[in-house]
Amino acid sequence: MRRRLIIFFLTGYCIIPVFAQGEINEQQKIFFRNERSFAFLLNSDGYGGSYREAKRIDFLNKRFFEIEAGNIKHPREYRMQNPYYQTPGSFKYGKINGAIYLRGSIGRQHELYKKADLGGVAVRYFYSGGPTLAFYKPVYYKILYPVSAYEYQIKEEKLDVIQHPPYDIYSKAPWVKGLGETRVIPGLFIKGGVNFEYSKEEKVIHAIEAGFTLSGYLKEIPIMATTDNQAILLSLFVSYRFGVVIDPLNPETNKFSYIFKRKKATPAY
């Protein structure tokens, strides 16, 4: 996961300068640049998505509200198959609970460099914080029980690492199994990073973000049975953010569908 983060970040870092110079921007400027955007996140401990609304404070600063959700992976999770039998499914031995998070935050964004021309890059930094909830549910496994020398019975049970070695596991049970046993742990988090906004359109947002998140929960999140679990989690992230700039004079461009519209070429005569 860390290798993928490094490759993703370095690729974005190398690609963005290509857009640093371009044509003079003749598009109509939007003075009150309030923004709405979505993001896909790749974290060092999982992946997720977020929705953000940013309100203009002044020429260089914005205040934003954000909702984010994603999964939480333990660094010792490894996918494997039964070492002795050919089974169709895989599992992560030692994992007793699957965990996801839900966060809500208030933050601030400051613009360091504005776009000089069409195709330029605006550089900003941001920070935020707020409450976070970790939801976890037990993981059920399909476990092999011998009936005779050549026959086995499969039962869906929670993992007991003392009674169930890896060669007793057929595969993981369906994800919905154990959903009614979900538990929640509250906490707080802070987040910070940099934003490179490179859209060529005044009313559309395309950006790469990178930074860190530090989360603290009231108790450890019990993900693995055989490895220490933690209540304080530090993760790095990179994300792709896309959205629209709110234009009060042209409401039609405030919809997310505007991002996917393509300008029709005007034939030359």
PLM region spans:
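Flexible, solvent-exposed coil segments and beta strand-coil junctions
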Residues: 25-33, 79-90, 166-175, 216-219
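Residues that define the transmembrane beta-barrel architecture of outer-membrane proteins
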Residues: 32-36, 43-47, 61-63, 98-102, ...
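Outer-membrane beta-barrel translocator/channel fold
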Residues: 68-103, 107-118
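Extracellular loop and loop/strand-boundary signature of outer-membrane beta-barrel proteins
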Residues: 24-26, 35-37, 52, 88-93, ...
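Membrane-embedded beta-strand positions of outer-membrane beta-barrel proteins
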Residues: 38-40, 51, 65-69, 104-106, ...
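Outer-membrane beta-barrel transmembrane domain signature
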Residues: 128-208, 213-229, 240-248
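Short loop/turn motifs that connect adjacent beta-strands in outer-membrane beta-barrel proteins
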Residues: 22-34, 56-64, 76, 96, ...
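Bacterial Sec-dependent N-terminal signal peptides
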Residues: 1-25, 234, 238-240, 268-269
